[in-house]
């Protein structure tokens, strides 16, 4: 039996505890369920905005000359022909056509991609990708434990982000940009669905 002390913690765990979050187990991670009440927090996000720690979601990088070809092999969408800084929603299917997971694929360049997957399917996808790699040349890395991820949602979040960058509020849907602040690098996208 897994105890709360055995669970993975996101980089924001300390802040969740300090701000009184009710923490629960979710796919092997200790995650905040709520801070005040579900109704109050729902209303806040619908009327203004909210920040969600989604660091438990899987994040992979694919780099090298065949990275796009490999992603075309495992995804239901055309990935290699995406534009730079474009994001595409896709499915990763099994050999019978059933869905292993739904993912978002980000194209940094012709030879560099990032994928975000659901936390519950992360290890299954890592295994699947290793099985079907074949002779394609690319480097795969699971960067989940080395990075953090947040989602900002709500009608007023662009007003807040405008104070940090003039570019971010002008991003089109399913596009991204890369920013930095001090030593931290950020990938910022408009990908809600």
Write out the residue ranges for each language-model feature:
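Basic, glycine/lysine-rich polyanion-binding surfaces/domains
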Residues: 1-193
């Amino acid at each position: 039996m897994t105890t709360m002390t055995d669970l993975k913690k996101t980089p924001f765990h300390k802040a969740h505890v300090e701000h009184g979050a009710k923490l629960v187990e979710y796919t092997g991670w200790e995650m905040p369920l709520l801070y005040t009440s579900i109704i109050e927090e729902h209303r806040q996000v619908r009327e203004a905005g909210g920040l969600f720690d989604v660091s438990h979601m899987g994040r992979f990088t694919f780099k090298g000359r065949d990275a796009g070809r490999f992603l075309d092999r495992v995804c239901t969408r055309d990935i290699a022909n995406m534009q730079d800084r474009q994001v595409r929603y896709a499915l990763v299917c099994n050999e019978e056509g059933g869905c292993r997971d739904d993912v978002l694929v980000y194209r940094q360049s012709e030879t560099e991609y990032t994928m975000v997957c659901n936390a519950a399917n992360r290890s299954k996808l890592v295994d699947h990708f290793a099985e079907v790699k074949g002779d394609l040349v690319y480097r795969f890395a699971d960067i989940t434990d080395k990075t953090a991820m947040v989602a900002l949602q709500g009608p007023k979040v662009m007003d807040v982000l405008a104070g940090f960058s003039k570019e971010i509020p002008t991003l089109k849907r399913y596009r991204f940009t890369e920013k930095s602040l001090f030593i931290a690098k950020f990938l910022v996208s408009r990908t809600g669905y």
